[in-house]
Every structure is written in structure tokens, then in C-alpha cells.
């Protein structure tokens, strides 16, 4: 491990939130200038009892920023760094207030790099739907996953990557190291991470990935014009698994079109729509549902299979299970032969 990363690990293991960092169910920790809150996947958002001052918070953040070769001060008031299995965002006190007082704030997001959370035993979706999605990636179908923040998009990507055929070449593209976990060791996986200090962004890496001769390009999240390059790569016969933010299942296509139009405002709406529907095979929508007791459930709520440019819903609204009879006969026979 890099010496600086080792020092960060030591700092975190003995810091004021170390017990939260050690809990595998906690994914987000935030400080609003006075209180610390955390997001527990079992209990929802909770308040953490901790007596700490803004000065102590600043010392903690300053240490991390220095070890990440970044600055955090009045002149550099926004900190955005990734390290180990964390992403830290902090705001200096000249930009933030709490009851009129200048304060620091931060949000620390923690990623699970040890295991894949979705399985046929989880309540994310049914075993039939997961088996169908496993078949889809083995058949090199392109998949677009949409949902709100923290709805399970990345976890679904991890599950799908782990279902790829042996000896396939996969290039994963991300702004952080969230998807770099232990997968099937017989799949050839390369992870490319952006470096904004060197002006290397997602768009650059998508173009670079094509030179690796991949079977699949996995873009952790399309936020802007790089979505057009993913779409272009599909024209070359390269399959993709990509996520985007969308408010509902009905806005997935519109959101994807908007991303393409960022640098191409004059492109025809219907032309872009038809291109998307031609080169993606599956559209998925996932949701984060907050229960009455505050606990959180993440579920796959929509699965559409694109047939001749038309998205066909594959989830039975009554059973929430796979409508296998809507799948084209040739594919359906293959699924049945594999035990679905």
C-alpha cells in the first residue's frame, strides 16, 4: 500500500468516527457544523453522539487533505478527494453557516469493497430476474441502469460484472475506485480512474478504453457528454453497462437524450432516441425505499427489454417477477435450457 494511504488508514482507525467506519452497514457519515449524522442501511439516518469542535474537525480534514496532496483552506474552500474505500467532500467555513455561525461541514461516503451485496437471497429483486440479467451479460447485451442517488445502481453493476463470461476483457471507468472489488478471477478487468488535476476526465477515458479492445465497457456513472462516447462505442459492437441519474422510470430515455445533447444541442431528439433504443438492450430502474421505521430497502422496480426499438416491460405488476413470456422465443428457449 502507498505510504500516504497507510497513514490515512491509521488516522481513520483512531479518529472520532472510527466505530462508524468499522460498521459494514453504515455507508454515509456527515457533519453539518454542529452534529454528526450517519446513514445505516438497517436503521436509516441516525444521529451520532460525539462531543467535538469545529477546530478538531478542521485538523482532521486538513490532515487528510495534505495526505491526498490537496488543499483545504480559505482560498481552497472545497475539498473533494477519494482514498481507500472512501470519498470525502468538505466545505470550508467561509461558505457554510450554522445558526449564523461560520462552520465547516463534510460528508464521507464509504464503499463496500469486500463483497457484492446483491444475491438471489437478497430482497433487491427476484431470483428469476437476477438469472435473466446474468444471462443478459453473458450474451453481451448492453444495459442502462437508472435511479436516484444511493438507490443501488452501483451494487447492481457489481453483480452484473461478476456474471460476465470467463476470459472476457472488461474496462471499468470511474471517478473513484468504487467498482474495483474482487470479481471472477478469470475475467480480464482493467479499472481506469479520472485525474482532474491532469485534466483527464470520463470522456477521455471512454475514448481510451476503446484502445483496450474490450468486450465490455463499464461506465460507473454517466454525468455528462461522455454518455455520447459510450453510445458511439456501442456502434462499434462493444457492449456497455452504464448508470445515469433519473427521477423515474419514465424519464430514463429523456435523461439519456439530454446527456447526448450537452455538446450536440442541434441533434434531432428522435434521432438520438432511436439510436439509444437501437444500441441498448435493457433498461433498468432501481429505487431506494424508506420504510415506516426509517430503515432502507433498495429494489429493482422496472425492467424493460428493448425489442425492435420498443421497450417492453418484463416485470409482472402483481408478482414483481419476470414475465418470461414477453421475451422473444429464441432467447426464451435459451433461458429455459439454462434452468430459468
Segments and roles (model prediction):
Residues 1-46:
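N-terminal anchoring/assembly modules that precede and organize ATP-driven motor systems
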Residues 142:
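Walker A (P-loop) ATP-phosphate-binding motif of ABC ATPase nucleotide-binding domains
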Residues 150:
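Walker A (P-loop) phosphate-binding loop of P-loop NTPases
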Residues 39, 43-139:
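P-loop NTP-binding catalytic core
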Residues 153:
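Conserved lysine of the Walker
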Residues 145-147:
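Hydrophobic anchor at the beta1->P-loop junction of P-loop NTPases
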Residues 159-277, 287:
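Switch/coupling sub-region of P-loop NTPases
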Residues 1-20, 292-340:
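NTP-binding/hydrolysis catalytic cores, primarily Walker-type P-loop NTPases
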Amino acid at each position: 500500500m502507498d505510504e500516504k494511504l497507510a497513514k490515512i488508514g491509521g488516522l481513520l482507525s483512531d479518529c472520532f468516527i472510527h466505530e462508524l467506519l468499522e460498521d459494514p452497514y453504515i455507508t454515509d457519515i456527515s457533519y453539518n457544523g454542529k452534529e454528526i449524522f450517519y446513514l445505516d442501511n438497517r436503521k436509516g439516518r441516525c444521529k451520532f453522539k460525539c462531543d467535538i469542535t469545529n477546530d478538531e474537525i478542521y485538523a482532521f480534514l486538513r490532515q487528510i487533505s495534505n495526505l491526498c496532496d490537496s488543499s483545504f483552506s480559505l482560498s481552497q474552500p472545497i475539498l473533494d478527494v477519494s482514498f481507500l474505500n472512501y470519498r470525502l467532500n468538505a466545505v470550508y467555513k467561509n461558505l457554510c453557516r450554522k445558526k449564523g455561525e461560520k462552520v465547516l461541514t463534510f460528508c464521507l461516503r464509504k464503499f463496500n469493497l469486500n463483497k457484492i451485496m446483491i444475491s438471489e437471497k437478497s430482497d433487491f429483486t427476484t431470483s428469476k430476474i437476477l438469472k435473466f440479467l446474468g444471462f443478459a451479460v453473458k450474451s453481451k447485451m448492453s444495459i442502462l441502469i437508472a435511479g436516484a442517488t444511493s438507490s443501488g445502481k452501483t451494487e447492481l453493476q457489481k453483480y452484473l460484472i461478476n456474471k460476465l463470461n470467463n476470459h472476457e476483457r472488461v474496462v471499468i471507468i470511474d471517478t473513484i475506485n468504487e467498482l474495483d472489488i474482487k470479481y471472477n478471477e478469470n475475467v480480464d478487468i482493467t479499472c481506469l480512474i479520472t485525474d482532474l488535476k491532469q485534466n483527464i476526465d470520463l470522456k477521455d477515458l471512454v475514448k481510451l478504453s476503446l484502445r483496450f479492445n474490450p468486450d465490455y465497457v463499464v461506465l460507473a456513472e454517466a454525468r455528462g457528454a461522455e454518455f455520447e462516447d459510450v453510445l458511439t462505442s456501442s456502434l462499434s459492437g462493444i457492449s456497455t453497462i452504464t448508470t445515469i441519474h433519473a427521477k423515474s422510470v419514465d424519464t430514463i430515455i429523456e435523461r439519456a437524450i439530454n446527456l447526448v445533447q450537452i455538446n450536440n444541442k442541434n441533434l434531432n431528439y428522435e434521432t438520438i432516441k432511436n439510436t439509444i433504443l437501437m444500441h441498448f438492450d435493457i433498461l433498468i430502474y432501481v429505487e431506494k425505499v424508506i420504510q415506516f421505521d426509517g430503515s432502507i430497502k433498495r429494489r429493482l422496480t422496472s425492467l424493460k427489454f428493448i425489442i425492435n426499438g420498443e421497450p417492453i416491460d418484463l416485470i409482472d405488476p402483481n408478482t414483481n417477477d419476470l414475465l418470461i413470456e414477453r421475451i422473444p422465443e429464441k432467447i426464451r428457449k435459451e433461458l429455459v435450457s439454462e434452468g430459468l
